[in-house]
Amino acid sequence: MPKYRSATTTHGRNMAGARALWRATGMTDADFGKPIIAVVNSFTQFVPGHVHLRDLGKLVAEQIEAAGGVAKEFNTIAVDDGIAMGHGGMLYSLPSRELIADSVEYMVNAHCADAMVCISNCDKITPGMLMASLRLNIPVIFVSGGPMEAGKTKLSDQIIKLDLVDAMIQGADPKVSDSQSDQVERSACPTCGSCSGMFTANSMNCLTEALGLSQPGNGSLLATHADRKQLFLNAGKRIVELTKRYYEQNDESALPRNIASKAAFENAMTLDIAMGGSTNTVLHLLAAAQEAEIDFTMSDIDKLSRKVPQLCKVAPSTQKYHMEDVHRAGGVIGILGELDRAGLLNRDVKNVLGLTLPQTLEQYDVMLTQDDAVKNMFRAGPAGIRTTQAFSQDCRWDSLDDDRANGCIRSLEHAYSKDGGLAVLYGNFAENGCIVKTAGVDDSILKFTGPAKVYESQDDAVEAILGGKVVAGDVVVIRYEGPKGGPGMQEMLYPTSFLKSMGLGKACALITDGRFSGGTSGLSIGHVSPEAASGGSIGLIEDGDLIAIDIPNRGIQLQVSDAELAARREAQDARGDKAWTPKNRERQVSFALRAYASLATSADKGAVRDKSKLGG
């Protein structure tokens, strides 16, 4: 029978000092035999996805206490990728994932907490907490802050839906008037919550459902809706049950590594491909799998991508649907239901509620359930009122979207495409693979060949695009922006958005060893591995080289002879200490970022730290 971890600090005469300090936090004699549960919050006023979380930790804590536990709350940092985008701040985004994971480990292990409730939401916070949860392997439940409502505005006598990406594109489009750009900017992000499309934050929150670590509805129920409060209340109660099951009944099925098994990771990736999730999810799932000591690699993702169709299409791949529409169609469980009926899921998995996949679908799939309360929950919709308050409205759609032929979520027979929304490509400068969000690629450019325009920083590429130096047919290559080379693996949302602003969204390709925002669409290929700074062949591409992209056949090829590439590699190696570094880039890199770069691996490994360099 496992012993409560917290007993280390609450039992025994030699722990008198620790108990004295616990008493100073409000604990009493009666508390010293109870499980101590960490409420891992991420409230900050910097990030709209987290601005409403201040009081939600208290909400969870009250339920933990009522159920017989002791709740202790702390916060992690949270970087807003949208605000950090387009300048040096983006260098810090991906490294913050590791800081978040480490900070959770530090706090939980330093104080010997028995379990956790993770209140996450945005891009690196959910992955960081997920990595920590699987590293620590103590009972955990995720409950996120929820998606933002889609923006809406009237243009040309028509009400259109908007999000952050629209504001960026129109702001850089010289054909758009100042007044229209201002109107879109003011309408794009109307409420608290994670940005309203299937961007990285919402993709990851959906994946925690598929992994079994959060409750049904977590990935899609709006931040502003009153129904979301119940997820927080339930999480506080349920975590105490899971904790007692493990420590008092020796039930290891309550542990995250036994819930988020390899089968669950395969289901999560299947969901991701089917819903056209952010390419960043590949990075984060690979990293989380390593923390769980699960053998889950790019090869597994490649195999899944070849058999899973696209059953859901959401912004940025279409402006017709946002997360509020996914929820109306049944949310994550609705997509999983269609995948299950197509025979594409592992059914022998359980979630934090203790339900198997078939049981979850029977109770929560809107196409199967007979529970009116569940149907009512999935009718939760937007209010269209600007607010930063959680649970501030109770609007509902008149009906569910259960049209699996023409609705937001489709059945296998009516799939958006036979190929899924993500694909892994391999070639002579991406030997370990690269990722493309096929959900956002127009059919006309699934095969594309063009001359390279090479840039050794995102900044130079943006200047060239806005300066008219990139023309239709070009393949923009941005290198030395990987985890080590950036350092920090910046997102390339500005270059891809500006290609659209310049009318080149369907006329150019962009390839990088960096990564893309979940808001990116178009022929945008990222995570090229190995990265240039690690001696990857992307560092050998020269202006004018022809690059052939073949998504249907999963290929990407630099049309240069092996002999020429060998000569270029020899010349690069001859640069000595300057080899595999940018030739003409001035960038201030802090000590913290240099420390991150010294251990960073390429994207095909999840951009995690190289344990071999630490003797691990």
From Swiss-Prot:
Pathway(s) the chain acts in: Amino-acid biosynthesis; L-isoleucine biosynthesis; L-isoleucine from 2-oxobutanoate: step 3/4; Amino-acid biosynthesis; L-valine biosynthesis; L-valine from pyruvate: step 3/4
Ligand binding ([2Fe-2S] cluster): C122, C195
Top-rank taxon, per record: Bacteria
Record note on quaternary structure: Homodimer.
Function field: Functions in the biosynthesis of branched-chain amino acids. Catalyzes the dehydration of (2R,3R)-2,3-dihydroxy-3-methylpentanoate (2,3-dihydroxy-3-methylvalerate) into 2-oxo-3-methylpentanoate (2-oxo-3-methylvalerate) and of (2R)-2,3-dihydroxy-3-methylbutanoate (2,3-dihydroxyisovalerate) into 2-oxo-3-methylbutanoate (2-oxoisovalerate), the penultimate precursor to L-isoleucine and L-valine, respectively.
UniProt family annotation: Belongs to the IlvD/Edd family.
The protein's name: Dihydroxy-acid dehydratase
